[in-house]
From Swiss-Prot:
Belongs to the peptidase T1B family. SUPFAM superfamilies: N-terminal nucleophile aminohydrolases (Ntn hydrolases). It is found in: Cytoplasm; Nucleus. Coiled coil: none annotated. This is Probable proteasome subunit beta type-4. Non-catalytic component of the proteasome, a multicatalytic proteinase complex which is characterized by its ability to cleave peptides with Arg, Phe, Tyr, Leu, and Glu adjacent to the leaving group at neutral or slightly basic pH. The proteasome has an ATP-dependent proteolytic activity. It holds the Pfam family Proteasome. It comes from Meyerozyma guilliermondii (strain ATCC 6260 / CBS 566 / DSM 6381 / JCM 1539 / NBRC 10279 / NRRL Y-324) (Yeast).
């Protein structure tokens, strides 16, 4: 029942994730953050099997931080981070116990000054998109994003569109997902909006 949404706009990337951690029909926690800060300009939002998501997220977070330490505080770019995550999932799918994790990777490339949003699924498929979703958000919000997304949108426009998507999910989903955390990745780093 995870909800993961992302929108890339002109100056940043916005990500929304549901707060509810569920098991079957039970809500176990209503403050679950389904994102991990990989470095100062890369944020990973994830959905999937409960144990797999946390273990995979911690593994990716630790390895990107290890890279930064080894390379004299040089951080991986969003493109390099997406390639690393994709490779780990593609390698995992060929093992006896693959990770059942889907990822949205939001980033801001400080060298080019451009935001990015990468959609990566548990099979290791990766594509850079202007907007993306995993979980039930994909079923309910893709048409809304298709209709209202415009090239050249700014932060406020993107936030309004994300709120429209969340309102649509609240209206149409039969389960209460306890609201969403909204985070933004821009030239200044990663911030919690709501």
């Amino acid at each position: 029942m995870d909800i993961v949404l992302g929108i890339r706009v002109e100056d940043c990337t916005l990500v929304a994730t549901s707060k509810a951690a569920t098991r079957g029909i039970s809500v176990l926690k209503d403050t679950d953050d389904k994102t991990r800060q990989l470095n100062s300009h890369n944020l990973m939002a994830y959905s999937g099997e409960a144990g797999d998501t946390v273990q995979f997220a911690e593994y990716i977070q630790a390895n990107t931080q290890l890279y930064t330490m080894r390379e004299n505080d040089t951080e991986l770019s969003p493109k390099a981070t997406a390639s690393f995550v994709r490779n780990q999932l593609a390698t995992s799918i060929r093992s006896r116990k693959p990770y059942q994790v889907n990822v949205l990777l939001a980033g801001y490339d400080t060298n080019t000054g451009k935001p990015s949003l990468n959609w990566i699924d548990y099979l290791g498929t990766q594509v850079e998109l202007p907007y993306a979703a995993h979980g039930y958000a994909g079923f309910y919000c893709t048409s809304l994003l298709d209709k209202h997304y415009k090239k050249g949108m700014n932060f406020e426009d993107g936030l309004d569109l994300l709120k429209k998507c969340i309102k649509e999910l609240e209206t149409r989903m039969p389960i209460d997902f306890k609201g969403c955390y909204i985070k933004v990745v821009d030239k200044e780093g990663i911030k919690l909006v709501e």
